[in-house]
Amino acid sequence: MLLWLGEYLTQFYSAFNVFSYLTFRAIISTLTALFISLYFGPKLIRYLQKMQIGQTVRDDGPESHLSKSGTPTMGGLLILASIVISVLLWADLSNIYVWVVLFVIVSFGIVGFVDDYRKVIRKDANGLIARWKYFWQTVIGLSTALFLYFIAQGPNETALLVPFVKELLPQLGIFYVVMSYFVIVGTSNAVNLTDGLDGLAIVPTIMVAGAFALFAYVTGHVNFSAYLNIPHIALTSELVIVCTAIVGAGLGFLWFNTYPAQVFMGDVGSLALGAALGVIAILVRQELVLFIMGGVFVMETVSVILQVGSYKMRGQRIFRMAPIHHHYELKGWPEPRVIVRFWIISLILVLIGLATLKLR
């Protein structure tokens, strides 16, 4: 929005040309989302406390979690509002990719909101019935995948970029839709599973979003993409603004979500953020790199799959509790230790993911 205003005002005063610089808007997008989160965070927390919108803690989990009961939740509303406002202010709103990501964020946020609303406000322990949750995730994810497939303007936009391999660029065809669906829905649920400790999900999300800002920049830049031998997709440049908005909103939320948390993001935040990372990975053609950089999310999801599968087939559990972060808590690790070590793992994996830009 402000990009258009800046372009108009440039004819009267050349200093407004700064609004056309992507790097400038990326920095301001981060700061805008950060400011919104920090400013409205305390107000939202007080409102949630007043309305008694607090977290319900499982009685079969770690005993240390009992003290978290009643902590305000649905703080993801703050994250989503910060992202959307910042993107609307600083992104080029004529870019269809920007609107695709906003659609996914808001849509998955609505699904998460309904789930949180039923659990926290209507006191329905099950929240949104699982089959309905996955139904709406499927509708949104599949419709997004189909839309992207049909608006693709060239082979670069539907090819699979394989990390560490220079010449391998297989065309996916209609399989692009299937893969995109699983990336969006899978990442959404993976982040949701990871969101079980204070700050555990938001920091890896910030790291991955920050890395994707770089991927979006080089993919959208004709010279950098040629130098790094990655497919050039011009529209991805504006995703830098979306990624930096996620970083800013995430940092602002972390201020209140760090141990001991004053607020939890709830499903409204985790489902939306995960879906956002998924669709951004698809747009910049880095689905496999997301699998690397989001390794903590993958690890949490695999631990649940293994736990459930083992119990159903053998009647035995592999872990003391799943997702795996609870396993380490029950082994006696203090919560901050689990959180920080998972952050360290995430940082290492993000650096490996960034290395794929050059190591081919």
From Swiss-Prot:
It comes from the Bacteria. Its EC number is 2.7.8.13. It catalyses: UDP-N-acetyl-alpha-D-muramoyl-L-alanyl-gamma-D-glutamyl-meso-2,6-diaminopimeloyl-D-alanyl-D-alanine + di-trans,octa-cis-undecaprenyl phosphate = di-trans,octa-cis-undecaprenyl diphospho-N-acetyl-alpha-D-muramoyl-L-alanyl-D-glutamyl-meso-2,6-diaminopimeloyl-D-alanyl-D-alanine + UMP. The keyword Ribosomal protein does not apply. PROSITE patterns: MRAY_1 (PS01347), MRAY_2 (PS01348). It is a multi-pass membrane protein. This is Phospho-N-acetylmuramoyl-pentapeptide-transferase. It comes from Colwellia psychrerythraea (strain 34H / ATCC BAA-681) (Vibrio psychroerythus).
